[in-house]
Amino acid sequence: MCCAALAPPMAATVGPESIWLWIGTIGMTLGTLYFVGRGRGVRDRKMQEFYIITIFITTIAAAMYFAMATGFGVTEVMVGDEALTIYWARYADWLFTTPLLLLDLSLLAGANRNTIATLIGLDVFMIGTGAIAALSSTPGTRIAWWAISTGALLALLYVLVGTLSENARNRAPEVASLFGRLRNLVIALWFLYPVVWILGTEGTFGILPLYWETAAFMVLDLSAKVGFGVILLQSRSVLERVATPTAAPT
């Protein structure tokens, strides 16, 4: 009964929007190689955490974009009498990569386990309910699940600008400044995801056709993953302050 509104998956083919999926695959792969190169020679374990997490983010995203571009990560869902193309691998990507992005931010801010668990719990709930929205077979149900997912996003952003930002203010000024830049980037980009969803084919409004919807998600993904990682890992001196937050008195 609870899953009655979910449509069974059907085979689907990738259309002309595949160009954006291949660009996403290449972009994420290049980002991964860049981060691996930046991480060579880093010996401090705390600094290595940032490199490892960020490399996994773009590696997972590259694999999921490849899955979508080659037609594996796509299905069709019947909504009324219309077949919608749904890239389910996008949700698999987000399910793994967005918690890792939040973990990067949390480590930078020096958050405790409760704050990290709250952020990741809200994030997984947000992505899960978003996936249910995408796979639902009635327009009203899709919008309802989108609203629930968006509510989880707002709650997550509330914790991000509240508790996590308070933690960051207790760090060294340059660490707090870097956190602020990355936090603002995440807020701006993540807020656009539900907007693109509701305006695109998945939101059933169809103001954005699938071709441009796919392009928009690709640009957001590259900015939120590769762009985020570039800003974070270029600030090696700041990461050194995170690794050694206090200096021994001389």
Swiss-Prot record:
Pfam families: Bac_rhodopsin. GO terms for cellular component: plasma membrane. GO terms for molecular function: monoatomic ion channel activity; photoreceptor activity. The chain crosses the membrane at residues 19-37, 52-70, 87-104, 116-135, 143-162, 181-199, 213-232. Signal peptide: none annotated. Residues 38-51, 105-115, 163-180, 233-250 are cytoplasmic. It is found in: Cell membrane. Its main location: membrane. It comes from the Archaea. Residues 1-18, 71-86, 136-142, 200-212 are extracellular. GO terms for biological process: phototransduction; proton transmembrane transport. Keywords: Cell membrane, Chromophore, Hydrogen ion transport, Ion transport, Membrane, Photoreceptor protein, Receptor, Retinal protein, Sensory transduction, Transmembrane, Transmembrane helix, Transport. The record marks D93 as: Primary proton acceptor. Belongs to the archaeal/bacterial/fungal opsin family. This is Bacteriorhodopsin. It comes from Haloterrigena sp. (strain arg-4). The gene is bop.
